[in-house]
């Protein structure tokens, strides 16, 4: 088939003031090719004709033509002319509709999936929606030093080496592991060397790997009641039988744990989730003795331990362990920002080779750039300063919440004065249902979570989880006011008598 030619002069849009001439010409020609005004097989005007028509240097036009060739829009050689390709790059990037339709039809047939896939339940965490009172588990993201973080990021990019671009060991970037080991040793009394630290996308990934390594179908795993649902989901997905033990003011009630047959126990001793209590030293020693006697391993999730407002810090459970039976996990998502997706696990030496193997088969390693930036953020002292600053701010916000709640909610909801963390708990007057109260609060743009979302039983049936860290004092006051209106409406609806002052 003979090549098509055109005798028509092109009609191109005006060149924007700040756009280079070659870029303007490339964009204009590409647009006309995609729109069909320059159809497949047609010959473009010569570089001389375009130069004469638009008053451009031929070198500028040649540059634009070369870019069109490089991206697959035209073909040709000097002297033979330049022609629009019959198959454009956009066509290569999209599947035709008929093929899409066949794929959808095939997907409608039942698929054979593994036992894991049938057992696993979607864990979405906490919804990614705008912050409002009293959404729990959120730090004050507006106070994170974004400018400083960006500056360190750009510096790391300028200095990044070829070796760093290739990645790092499965367990993470060694300088970051060294910084984490030093930090948890100093602040939490954790006993470890850097080689025991694994950098992960978060504690949730650590739970998944621990479940894969330690839990067989039918094994018994113990958790606190109430408990972080992501942990329960990780263990159940691998076929674990979950045993729940209650929590009192000193922590998990060890007497409720089975005497034998438990493979693993998951606890949050530094700041029980979601109740907020701190496990006493005596209870920690009792739990360690039980674990040794029953040959169980312990997964210690030390989330939120950085933000302690009263009382002396209690050393991590791992620091009291002299038998190598505790896996210690921490995260930067609440200390810095959730999207960072970096956490860590301190692994007992005997488990380290198997953990490294499992990690290498999972995500290879955590994102390298984020590890580099976080390493510098810690080394330069910004991490410690940020924690100290935010601890003061969060303590003030907790005080505002307690004072406002005492004045406005005292007869309907008693809020606990927690020693640490980003949220607290509130206990409803008898007769008001927590689920109904949460639904009523939501109609007034207030988020409170019923504790029943974290476990069964009457002991937590009247409890609500209430976040405060992400809210300015004025937002806390407004939230308490709206919550009071919602709870008063529930009191009237359920005809609960007013408490006398």
Q: What does each model-found stretch correspond to?
A:
Residues 320-354, 366-369:
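Active-site PLP attachment segment
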Residues 139, 269-273, 334:
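Short glycine-rich anion-binding loops that position phosphate/pyrophosphate groups of nucleotides
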Residues 344, 372-380:
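Helix-loop "lid/cap" segments that line or gate small-molecule binding pockets
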Residues 198, 243-245, 327, 416, ...:
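General small-molecule cofactor/ligand-binding pocket signal
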């Amino acid at each position: 088939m003979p090549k098509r030619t055109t005798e028509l002069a092109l009609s191109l849009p005006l060149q924007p003031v700040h756009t280079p001439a070659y870029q303007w010409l490339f964009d204009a020609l590409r647009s006309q090719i995609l729109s069909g005004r320059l159809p497949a097989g047609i010959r473009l005007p010569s570089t001389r004709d375009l130069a004469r028509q638009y008053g451009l240097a031929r070198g500028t036009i040649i540059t634009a033509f070369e870019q069109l060739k490089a991206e697959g829009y035209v073909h040709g050689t000097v002297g033979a002319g330049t022609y629009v390709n019959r198959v454009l790059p956009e066509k290569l990037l999209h599947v035709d509709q008929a093929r899409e339709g066949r794929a959808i039809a095939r997907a409608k047939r039942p698929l054979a999936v593994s036992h894991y896939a049938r057992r696993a339940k979607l864990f979405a965490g906490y919804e990614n929606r705008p912050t409002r009172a009293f959404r729990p588990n959120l730090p004050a993201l507006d106070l994170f030093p974004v400018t400083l973080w960006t500056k360190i990021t750009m510096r790391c990019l300028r200095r990044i080496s070829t070796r760093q671009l290739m990645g790092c060991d499965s367990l993470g970037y060694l300088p970051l592991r060294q910084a984490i080991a030093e930090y948890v040793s100093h602040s939490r009394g954790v006993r470890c060397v850097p080689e025991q630290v694994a950098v992960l996308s978060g504690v949730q990934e650590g739970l998944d790997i621990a479940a894969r390594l330690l839990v067989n179908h039918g094994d018994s795993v113990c958790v606190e009641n109430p408990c972080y649902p992501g942990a329960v989901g990780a263990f159940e997905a691998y076929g674990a039988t979950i045993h729940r033990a209650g929590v009192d003011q000193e922590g998990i009630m060890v007497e409720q744990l089975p005497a034998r047959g438990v493979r693993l126990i998951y606890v949050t001793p530094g700041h029980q989730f979601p109740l907020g209590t701190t496990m006493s030293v005596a209870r920690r020693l009792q739990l360690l003795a039980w674990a040794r006697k029953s040959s169980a391993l312990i997964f210690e999730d030390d989330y939120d331990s950085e933000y302690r407002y009263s009382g002396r810090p209690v050393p991590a459970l791992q620091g009291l362990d002299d038998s190598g039976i505790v896996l210690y996990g921490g995260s930067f998502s609440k200390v810095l920002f959730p999207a960072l997706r970096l956490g860590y696990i301190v692994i007992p030496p005997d488990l380290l080779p198997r953990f490294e193997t499992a990690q290498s088969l999972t995500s290879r390693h955590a994102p390298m750039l984020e590890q580099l930036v976080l390493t510098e953020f810690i080394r330069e002292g910004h991490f410690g300063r940020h924690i100290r600053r935010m601890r003061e701010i969060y303590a003030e916000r907790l005080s505002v919440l307690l004072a406002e709640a005492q004045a406005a909610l005292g007869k309907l909801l008693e809020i606990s004065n927690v020693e640490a963390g980003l949220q607290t708990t509130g206990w409803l007057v008898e007769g008001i249902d927590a689920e109904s109260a949460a639904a009523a609060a939501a109609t007034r743009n207030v988020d409170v979570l019923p504790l029943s979302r974290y476990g069964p039983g009457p002991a937590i049936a009247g409890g609500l989880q209430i976040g405060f860290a992400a809210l300015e004092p004025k937002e806390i006051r407004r939230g308490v006011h709206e919550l009071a209106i919602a709870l008063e409406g529930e009191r009237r609806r359920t005809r609960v008598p007013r408490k006398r002052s």
